[in-house]
Amino acid sequence: MNAEIIAVGSELLLGQIANTNAQFLSEKLAELGINVYFHTVVGDNAGRLEQAVRVAQARAELIIFTGGLGPTKDDLTKETIARLLGRELVIDEEALRSIEAYFARTNRTMTENNKKQALVLQGSTILKNEHGMAPGMAITLNSITYMLLPGPPKEMQPMFLKYGRPFLMEQLGRHERIESRVLRFFGIGESQLETDIEDLIDQQSNPTIAPLAGDGEVALRLTAKHHSEIEAKKLLDKAEQAILERVGRYFYGYNDETLFKKTVKMLKEKKKTIAAAESLTGGLFLTELTAIPGASQVVRGGVVCYANEVKEKVLHVPASVLTTDGAVSERCAQLLAENVRTLCHADIGISFTGVAGPDPLEGKPVGTVYIGISTPENETEVYALALPGQRDAIRIRTAKYGCSIILKKLAAAYEG
């Protein structure tokens, strides 16, 4: 099945909000084996929406709309689709009662235009809105399925997962299982990873292998279909094994796992604590770690040592090192890692120093990075990197490289 997603709302065209609904729906439809070939964004204009629908009808078997189901005059999705399909709009009594109950519960006066939110396409399947007022709806006519969903993500996402997805699975007449798995990699570019497994991607039709890139990471989505859930998972296992035989050294996790989540998880498993001295990253590393539930079990603390004075007075980096080697140097990174570990009584000390830009520093180019790792068992190691990108990209990639290094150290040094 081929699909098109039409997002309705002038605020999207004006760039006032991001179209996260299309991203969410594309991901979920891919898991169902539905091909999303087009994303369309239309402002609050009935004529242009009608034009977009006619284009979509010529190239898609499933058209999903987000937005335009509200009570105001510029909420015109239902009216436009009803006119195009020759369907009347009728009141859904359950939705109307829910809207009336909301206004009564909040002690507010319900204006007449709010009844508009209870209007649905005659003959459609109602998708309940358990997080808002306007229900969604779905209907199939002339071999095309139309699904109308609310615009707010907090309403749209749970509605689709609970009611929209089952509707589509029934429409597909699908008794086979669709299993999906995301493999996450760091330290390898998308082009290199794809080159390393190009023949696997070309040969695979079940499961399919789709590369995904973002924020200095690469992911592969594997999607398998089979009448048996067990057999579908076996197909995924076989494909995963073939991929990891080639690029396994860059692999770190599955699905929605992040490098920061994996780092906290492994520190817990190994019963190790960590402290950080952050110059280049300015606290970003510990901010990301401590956003993970349970991080308090493994994070001892840290120092944002942006100024050389702090490096010297708090973390005891000698002035001679800062003068001779520089703040952006292997020696400075080494001392920062060792001294923050001692200061915070942690098992592992990590340091970040470098040049994020936009200008060079101490004669070193933008993207120069040093990451120090100190443990009681081993001599402190310093990793020198040359990272591409703008300032923010360099900082987040540096923090992620720190996680990657820690994960490898934990796996190698603390087995068992």
UniProtKB/Swiss-Prot annotation:
InterPro entries assigned to the protein according to its UniProt record, in alphabetical order: CinA, CinA-like_C, CinA_C, CinA_KH, Competence-induced_CinA, MoaB/Mog-like_dom_sf, MoaB/Mog_dom
UniProt xrefs under SUPFAM superfamilies: CinA-like, Molybdenum cofactor biosynthesis proteins
Source organism superkingdom: Bacteria
Recorded family membership: Belongs to the CinA family.
Protein name: Putative competence-damage inducible protein
Gene name as annotated: cinA
